C-alpha cells in the first residue's frame, strides 16, 4: 500500500525566458488535482519543479513534510508519466515494468510478484512478452502506469499523459488512474488541456495563468457559470477553435 503524501510549494519562484513564475499552494495527500491553463502558463514547469527536473530560484518544495527542494529526481518520492517516450522499444512489456523495481532487471521473487500484480491491475495479462510497437497507445500508457505501481512512490505526476488518446480511451485511462489512486492512496497531479477531465474525476482544479496560480477549487465549482472569469475566458477561447 502506497502512503499518501501532501505536496507543498511555499513561495516558489522560477524564471523561464521572460516568464517569471510564482507558485504557493498545498495539495492534500491522496487528492487528485488537474492543472489547466493556456500554453506557456507554466503547467509543465509546475510538475518539473515537483519532480526535480527544475530547481526554483527561491522558495521551498516539500513532500510529506520533507524539504525536497534540492534533491535530485531519483531521490524524490515521485513517479512521472509523459505523453510519449515512456517505454524502451527493445524491451518487452514485462521488462519495461521490471525497470520500476530494478534498473539492471535483476528481480527477486517478491519483485516478480509485484510486477505480475501490477500488470494484472492495469489489464495487461497475457501481453507481458510483447514489445511496445505491438501495443496500442492506450496499452503503452498502461505499461507506464504499471511501472509506477511497482515503484510504490506516493506521488504520481501526469504531464498530458493521455492527450494523444481519443475521448473514450482517455476517460478509460483517467478512470484507471483514479481507481488506483483510491486503492493506493497516492497523490495525483495531472496537466491537461481538457478541463472536462477535471469534472470527470471530480478533481481539484488548479488554473495557471502567466506563471501564477490564478484560481483553484473543486472542478464542479470552478467550471460552473459562477467560476473565475479568467478561467471562463480561457475555456471560451478553447471552444472557439
UniProtKB/Swiss-Prot annotation:
Coiled coil: none
One of the record's GO cellular component terms: plasma membrane
CDD domains found in the cross-reference section: ABC_ThiQ_thiamine_transporter
Gene3D superfamilies to which the protein is assigned, alphabetical: P-loop containing nucleotide triphosphate hydrolases
Domain named ABC transporter: residues: 7-235
Single GO term (MF): ATP hydrolysis activity
Pfam families according to UniProt: ABC_tran (PF00005)
Ligand binding (ATP): 37-44
Localisation per UniProt entry: Cell inner membrane
InterPro entries: AAA+_ATPase, ABC_SmlMolc_Importer, ABC_transporter-like_ATP-bd, ABC_transporter-like_CS, P-loop_NTPase, Thiamine_ABC_ThiQ
E.C. number: 7.6.2.15
Annotated catalysed reactions: thiamine(out) + ATP + H2O = thiamine(in) + ADP + phosphate + H(+)
Keywords of the record: ATP-binding, Cell inner membrane, Cell membrane, Membrane, Nucleotide-binding, Translocase, Transport
Topology term for the membrane: Peripheral membrane protein
Family from the record: Belongs to the ABC transporter superfamily. Thiamine importer (TC 3.A.1.19.1) family.
Function, as annotated: Part of the ABC transporter complex ThiBPQ involved in thiamine import. Responsible for energy coupling to the transport system.
Quaternary structure (record): The complex is composed of two ATP-binding proteins (ThiQ), two transmembrane proteins (ThiP) and a solute-binding protein (ThiB).
Listed name of the protein: Thiamine import ATP-binding protein ThiQ
Organism, as annotated: Brucella suis biovar 1 (strain 1330)
Gene: thiQ
Amino acid at each position: 500500500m502506497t502512503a499518501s503524501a501532501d505536496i507543498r510549494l511555499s513561495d516558489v519562484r522560477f524564471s523561464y525566458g521572460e516568464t517569471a513564475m510564482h507558485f504557493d499552494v498545498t495539495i492534500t495527500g491522496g487528492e487528485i488535482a488537474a492543472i489547466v491553463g493556456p500554453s506557456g502558463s507554466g503547467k509543465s514547469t509546475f510538475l518539473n519543479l515537483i519532480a526535480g527536473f527544475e530547481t526554483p530560484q527561491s522558495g521551498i518544495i516539500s513532500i510529506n513534510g520533507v524539504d525536497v527542494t534540492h534533491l535530485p529526481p531519483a531521490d524524490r518520492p515521485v513517479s512521472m508519466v509523459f505523453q510519449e517516450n515512456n517505454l524502451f522499444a527493445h524491451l518487452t512489456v514485462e521488462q519495461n515494468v521490471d525497470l520500476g523495481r530494478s534498473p539492471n532487471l535483476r528481480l527477486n521473487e517478491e519483485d516478480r510478484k509485484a510486477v505480475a500484480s501490477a500488470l494484472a491491475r492495469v489489464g495487461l495479462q497475457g501481453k507481458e512478452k510483447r514489445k511496445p510497437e505491438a501495443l496500442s497507445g492506450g496499452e503503452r500508457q498502461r505499461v507506464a502506469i504499471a511501472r509506477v505501481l511497482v515503484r510504490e512512490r506516493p506521488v504520481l505526476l501526469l504531464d498530458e499523459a493521455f492527450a494523444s488518446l481519443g475521448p473514450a480511451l482517455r476517460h478509460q485511462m483517467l478512470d484507471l488512474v483514479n481507481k488506483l489512486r483510491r486503492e493506493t492512496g497516492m497523490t495525483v497531479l495531472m496537466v491537461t488541456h481538457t478541463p472536462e477531465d477535471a469534472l470527470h474525476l471530480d478533481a481539484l482544479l488548479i488554473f495557471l495563468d502567466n506563471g501564477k496560480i490564478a484560481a483553484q477549487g473543486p472542478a464542479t465549482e470552478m467550471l460552473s457559470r459562477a467560476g473565475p472569469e479568467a478561467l471562463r475566458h480561457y475555456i471560451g477561447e478553447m471552444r472557439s477553435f
